[in-house]
Amino acid sequence: MSTIISIRDLKKQFGDKWVTQGVNLDIPEGMMTVIIGRSGEGKSVLLKQVIGLIHPTSGEVLFKGINISKLSDRELEEQFKHIGYVFQFAALLDSLNTFENVGITLLENGMKAQDVLPIVKEKLSLVNLSEETLYKYPSELSGGMRKRVGLARTLVTNPEIILYDEPTTGLDPITARVIHELMYDMQKKLKLTSVVISHDLEIFKYADKVALLNDGKIAYFGDAKTIWESDNPYIYQFIRGLPEGPIQTEVAHFKDKF
């Protein structure tokens, strides 16, 4: 099992608050790794440090052995051709139709619309969207369809890795399962590496590895298939939703007042 991303002692400070406080994590190539943790724990900040949207205070991120934390913006842009990012909300431009939203990167780089069209059609097919959606606007699409359009847009650059930030936020359980299955199928079919931030424990069915972020550090890293059997106190408490344990929660503090 080879490592495609290595995170080494990654720290990030905003003002007087430390968000990540020495994260160490190896992301295995060709697998789905899910990162879980309390709300406000800094999972999205961690992901954005991985792709250079936020620069770490200290530490490093290695992509295929290259320390991307030290690269210039131009060098980062070159590396990011290999990495796709799916935002928590689809982040589609309301003024653009599906074709334009999916193909925007190619169109902005000077490709002709007639050359972009077959590429967009192919990516829409991969996420199970028909050509009928090509010229529809985000307001005409369901929440699940917008998520899939966002994924198709990520696929346009043929990434090796896709980072997902809460991909099923705002979706009902049925649609969320459809998105999870799609993510899994895409990973296997295209031989992708997936890193997923999620609060939806159903994702464990499709994941290979699970990492738990707590107090700015990785408190657990292990196999998703055996996670319910783990006796790690942090993961035991978190996946069962227990208010008491090593993870400090607002609920526990509230109970202490009575």
Model regions: which residues?
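Conserved ABC transporter NBD signature motif
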Residues: G59-N67
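Conserved ABC ATPase signature
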Residues: Y137-L141, M145
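Conserved catalytic motifs of ABC-family nucleotide-binding domains
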Residues: N158
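Catalytic Walker B motif of ABC-type/P-loop ATPase nucleotide-binding domains
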Residues: I162-D165
